[in-house]
Amino acid sequence: MKTMQIKDLFQVTSGNKLDFGKMATTENGVAFVSRSSRNNGVVGYIEKIGNVSPFESGLITVSLGGTYVLSSFVQPTEFYTAQNVAVLRPLVEMSIQEKLFYCMCISANRFRYSAFGREANRTLKYLEVPTREEIPEWVSSATIPDYSHIKKVTHSANSILIQFLMGSLGFVSYLILNTLNLWCTRIQRLKKVV
């Protein structure tokens, strides 16, 4: 399999390095991405900061340290980041399926790091991932359904769906489901604002 380094596919930047505890939170604000491995790394929503532009939607965030080092997510809305979160901007246009595939590839390198030991801040851009030509065909043919019409997925229904997907389709489906659930939540919040 042909591989290349992350830096040859993405522009790697260090994010905003903000402290969530010092931000003014609001339910309908800008997503705040930390090193969390849950909810696409989003720990809350904050008011826009006048002199700091949020990152645009569609970029990948990567946790550079902590227990879930290299947790990687495609952000469906604009966002700010905490410390130790990298932001990856594709150097060429990529589909959401390709971005999710690279999130999976990045996260799969977690074993190279230890929580609160070796962190990824210096080495992320040198991680080897498959070239775009090596992406399996099923990735580009995967359909990501539009769940924006669903108001709320109950916890039990969500758990059953996750169990089914984990057993039948594997980890990539889980990543896609996580992203879709987050997008649905954010779309509903945006509808409330408008």
What are these model-predicted stretches?
Residues 108-111:
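A common structural junction motif
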Residues 44-105:
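A short beta-sheet element
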Residues 18-22, 113-116, 128-129:
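Short, recurring structural edge motifs at helix starts
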Residues 82, 90-92, 96, 129, ...:
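Intrinsically disordered, charged low-complexity linkers and terminal tails
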Residues 1-19, 23-39, 132-194:
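Non-catalytic DNA-recognition/assembly elements of restriction-modification systems
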Residues 114-120, 150-154:
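A generic structural motif
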